[in-house]
């Protein structure tokens, strides 16, 4: 059976993105969380709302673009893959997080350029690299091959 790891989600940033560069190599990386709202009717036919909070990580030029264009409450559409990472917390406990590693991010809010409305922004990570951070912020990476 083929393995598929693909996520597309739209939502709003819960706070400003956190931008940094890795300790080894200075590779740009940004983390942010989005809230994705879902409306549905319950068994009594009353409208209910549920919110799902999802963490997102982006690398390289995609990270820099997020730093420059996104703020708390910005609307985005994220296309990426799920990744999990585990680390030891300062208290010695093991922690695991599942987040989306972004391949493409579409900025859904219109941006102003020279006082005029601009088109929605769309940025893609075309490096074909997979990046991971260990608990000390050191990056290790591997590239995947594409048939392109």
From Swiss-Prot:
Keywords: DNA-binding. Gene3D superfamilies: Nucleic acid-binding proteins. One of its GO terms (biological process) is DNA replication. One of its GO terms (cellular component) is nucleoid. The keyword S-adenosyl-L-methionine does not apply. InterPro entries: NA-bd_OB-fold, Primosome_PriB/ssb, ssDNA-bd. Residues 4-109 form the SSB domain. It comes from the Bacteria. The keyword NAD does not apply. GO terms for molecular function: single-stranded DNA binding. CDD domains: SSB_OBF. Homotetramer. This is Single-stranded DNA-binding protein 2.
């Amino acid at each position: 059976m083929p393995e598929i790891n693909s996520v597309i989600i739209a939502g709003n940033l819960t706070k400003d993105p956190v931008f940094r560069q890795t300790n080894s190599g200075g590779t740009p990386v940004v983390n942010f969380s989005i809230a994705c709202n879902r409306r549905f009717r319950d068994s009594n036919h009353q409208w209910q709302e549920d919110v799902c909070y999802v963490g997102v990580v982006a690398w390289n030029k995609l990270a820099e673009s997020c730093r420059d264009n996104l703020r708390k409450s910005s609307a985005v559409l994220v296309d990426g893959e799920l990744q999990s990472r585990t680390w030891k917390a300062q208290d010695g406990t093991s922690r695991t997080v599942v987040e989306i590693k972004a391949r493409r991010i579409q900025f859904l809010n219109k941006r102003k350029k020279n006082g005029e409305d601009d088109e929605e922004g769309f940025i893609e990570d075309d490096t074909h690299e997979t990046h991971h951070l260990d608990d000390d912020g050191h990056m290790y990476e591997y590239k995947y091959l594409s048939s392109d």
